[in-house]
Regions:
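Short, Lys/Arg-enriched N-terminal segment that forms or immediately precedes the first helix
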Residues: 2-18
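Short, cationic-aromatic polyanion-contact patches
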Residues: 13-23, 38, 69-93
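Short acidic, hydrophobic short linear motifs in intrinsically disordered regions
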Residues: 36-44
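Amphipathic alpha-helical dimerization/coiled-coil segments
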Residues: 87-112
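A short, conserved structural fragment
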Residues: 61-71
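Pre-recognition alpha-helix immediately N-terminal to the DNA-recognition helix
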Residues: 25-29
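Basic amphipathic alpha-helical segments that dock to polyanions
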Residues: 31, 42, 53, 57-63
Length: 112
């Protein structure tokens, strides 16, 4: 998509609307590609250490972007799995952020 003299990628719009840093967006994208995934699987897939991923995933859960749920293992114990919130829910959040930006930009132009 192009806006005046600058090309804007949809990834930038999504990341900006959801308040994601570049490194967080990579995790977000990996979650979008999976139905649900464990910390260990994500760590291996993205080549990120578990501590870094835990911080990012906690932030995602706190910001209601991702669901965390527990799966009990057959041999005892459990593993936490992470799943992205529904895409339609996220689209609504992104569109709301875009509308807010648009209104702010419009007011700024009117005040100019």
């Amino acid at each position: 998509m192009e806006f005046a003299c600058k090309k804007i990628d949809v990834q930038d719009i999504i990341a900006c609307s959801l308040g994601l840093k570049k490194s967080e967006y990579k995790v977000f994208e990996a979650l979008l590609q999976s139905d649900h995934v464990s910390l260990k699987e994500l760590s291996k897939k993205l080549n990120l250490d578990r501590t870094t991923l835990q911080k990012i995933l906690k932030r995602f859960v706190d910001n209601d972007l991702v669901q965390r749920f527990q799966e009990n293992l057959d041999n005892g114990g459990y593993v936490f799995l992470y799943k992205i919130k529904g895409k339609e829910i996220l689209k609504k959040r992104i569109n709301a952020a875009l509308e807010k930006w648009y209104e702010t930009a419009k007011l700024s132009i009117e005040k100019w």
